[in-house]
Amino acid sequence: MMKGHFCIQNNKTLLFKSLIHPTSSHNLSPYLYFFLSSNKLNSSNISSSNFVITSNIRGYSSSQYSNKVYSWGSGLNGKLGHGLDETKIVVPKEIEIKEDDDNNRVFNQGKINKITSGTTYSIFSGYDQIKDRQVFYGCGDNRDAQLIVGNGKIQSLENIELLESPMLKSDQMKGKQLKQLISGTYHNACILNDSNSNNNNNNNKDRSLILLWGASNSGQIGSPEYNRVQYDPYNNKVLSEIGIKKISMGATFTIALSNDGKLYSFGSSTFNELGNGDMFNEREPKLIDNQLLQDNEIIDLECGFFHTVALTSDNKILTWGRNQESQCFPVPEGTGKGSFTNVQYLDTSSLGDHDKIIQIGASNLNSYILTENGNIYSIGSNDHGQCGIEKSNFKKGILNKIKIGDDGNIKVKKFYSRFKTVIVETTDGRFFGWGSNFDHQLALETRCIYFTPMELNNLNRLHKDYNIIDISISLSHCISLNSNPQK
């Protein structure tokens, strides 16, 4: 909460000046003015010449007020950020650090701006103005160096802690701000750019810093040297020199999208995850050796456990990798686990001729497409309801249109998919979800599989109080990044 002085203008508007953060000795902005309706405050909010702005006040921007982080699902290993006492959470709960010291300054002042979660852990990041660099926090499992610290001596973090290492404290981090933070199953990556650089400009590629850490036994970190795990984040200068705008991660492989629309892959290739048409692992990033990919400009990509989908500039989808569950194209029943496909076009004929694809996604054994008109489609395994289609209506190996709401016509704004759970935000600001809820990943009380979209009222209430701006779904838990309340 923030305190400051106020005066009333025209009996309707409050003028707030010189807002002070209670844990700071200096003004957040010496000449900061806010105009709010006077009916947002009551006498209990005001003491002498000070006032308290509470979380139910609407109409302020996230750059001026603090972000919040919430979690729900299974609390095993402390990955929810609430210690070991919280074994499960159904109603999303705000994550707070009780110790108010310099290490926790960024988290406690609400400056977290990126979140991610792997199989059994959570990571949060924000920019520390005093240290002039991005800082990272984490909780949960650390047996594969997912949380950077300990060098093998700390198996898990039961509570949220600051994650520091020689690389993260080096001068190379100075002035670099986080563009992307992402997790695979047990490995992670981030892209950092100078705050004054144009992230999509090839001329600035040498300014980027691309770090990878965690499990690295299959080469998924991109280092030429073999390490089973990588604690201190590896500075992948090969990717920095190429110029990368996005990274996506599967179970044990990584694919990077360059500024000029090309894909570079490294890691395991048991199912042709790397797209080269073979089963040879790669330790360092290499341009994918495939004519279809080289002939197309790729504008987005997403990796599932062992397959990938990529969106081209002409609104087509390319896909490759494991295909036992028909997530790339139809295969006969009983196809073996070793089934995989080379790079090929996904059949999108069920979409309208002028239906532009605006988002793609991939989870364990599934792929998803969201179009400009608000329709969402799924393909792949439906064993845990991941496709959002009743068993009797599900068609294997082709895109299934998912119907949201009682009439099936509610439009989708964006979606979040990972493992066996999907959550969508609709254009009218509501949340629906389907798939596995065995660990309350959907914030629903009943532990079961949901084959069709269910409205998620716990998330609706959270969104009403504090805007949900990002959700990271893991195997058995979820975390969300939330900003200011809606107007």
UniProtKB/Swiss-Prot annotation:
Superkingdom as given in the UniProt entry: Eukaryota
Positions of RCC1 repeats: 66-127, 207-259, 260-313, 373-426, 428-483
Pfam family for this entry, one: RCC1
Protein name: RCC1 repeat-containing protein DDB_G0284033
Keyword Glycoprotein: no
Source organism of this protein record: Dictyostelium discoideum (Social amoeba)
InterPro entries in the record: Ran_GTPase-activating, RCC1/BLIP-II, Reg_chr_condens
Keywords, comma-separated and alphabetical: Repeat
Residue pairs linked by disulfide bridges in the UniProt entry: none
Transmembrane segments: none
